């Protein structure tokens, strides 16, 4: 069950020299505490939709599971803000220090956890996908068209997964990492192969977002914004094509340009 993503409130708006009373929509920020095998694992600040996909994708991106079948049971109690997960295996000692973490909607995890765990889980892409410039531009246009809640609030991150021609699904969330985890969970639940897929993302490609793409296993990530220097380094090391500044019929290729073919 999903709670309301948007809420309305009466506000005062200044416009054209006047203060006007009106109603505005804003996004819901929902804390979801994930308990794994009876132990508190993390609290994720998220938009309260597709929460089962979020939990599955989050656990996979943390390396707690590798496939959906490793989850024996998963129950969402959205009235209290808990996800109760029972795995078919123990988590192991390497997760002991990472329990009870707060994953905020605005940022990623601490640098310590990023280097200790995230980089170890990231996979070097073996993707054979190739794309034309037209496909790149069309995918970003498609993401912007699908981002209905962002148009209403300006407060959500958007992500989609595609084979270059067709969108398989898109997700929106107050947290940029959550949008990708929801897509990851969607693919795991439906056993969708991701090696030759593309991630389309509304935000900046940071090192953490690039690592998230590597964990998911895609070979290409697209964004309307620019990547960071560490993200470019990681993209080159992990054989991922990172493309940014997709706007007005142009884009920049920052790593592994061999996947983009100029001929239409």
From Swiss-Prot:
The gene for this chain is fdhD
- Provide the GO MF annotations for this entry: sulfur carrier activity; sulfurtransferase activity
**What does UniProt give as GO cellular component?**
cytoplasm
Q: What processes in GO biological process is this protein linked to?
A: Mo-molybdopterin cofactor biosynthetic process
Q: Where in the cell is it found?
A: Cytoplasm
**Protein source organism:** Staphylococcus haemolyticus (strain JCSC1435)
Which Pfam families does the protein's record reference?
A: FdhD-NarQ
Catalytic residues, chain numbering: 107
Provide the protein name. Answer: Sulfur carrier protein FdhD
């Amino acid at each position: 069950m999903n709670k309301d993503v948007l809420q309305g409130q009466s506000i005062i708006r200044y416009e054209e020299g006047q203060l006007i009373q009106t109603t505005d929509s804003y996004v819901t920020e929902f804390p979801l505490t994930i308990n794994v095998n009876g132990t508190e694992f993390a609290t994720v600040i998220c938009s309260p939709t597709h929460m089962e996909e979020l939990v599955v994708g989050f656990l996979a991106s943390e390396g707690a599971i590798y496939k959906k079948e490793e989850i024996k049971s998963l129950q969402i109690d959205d009235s209290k803000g808990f996800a109760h997960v029972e795995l078919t295996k123990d988590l192991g000692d390497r997760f002991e220090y990472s329990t009870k973490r707060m994953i905020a909607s605005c940022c990623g995890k601490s640098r310590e956890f990023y280097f200790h765990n995230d980089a170890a889980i990231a996979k070097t892409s073996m993707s054979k996908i190739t794309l034309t410039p037209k496909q790149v531009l069309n995918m970003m246009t498609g993401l912007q068209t699908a981002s209905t809640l962002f148009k209403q609030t300006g407060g959500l991150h958007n992500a989609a997964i595609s084979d270059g021609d067709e969108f398989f699904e898109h997700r929106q969330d107050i947290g940029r990492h959550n949008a990708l985890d929801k897509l990851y969970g969607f693919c795991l639940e439906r056993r969708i192969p991701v090696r030759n897929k593309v991630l389309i993302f509304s935000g900046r490609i940071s090192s953490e977002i690039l690592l998230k793409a590597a964990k998911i296993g895609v070979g290409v990530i697209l964004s309307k914004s620019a990547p960071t220097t560490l993200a470019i380094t990681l993209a080159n090391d992990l054989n991922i094509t990172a493309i940014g500044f997709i706007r007005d019929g142009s884009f920049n290729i920052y790593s592994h340009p061999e996947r983009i073919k100029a001929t239409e």
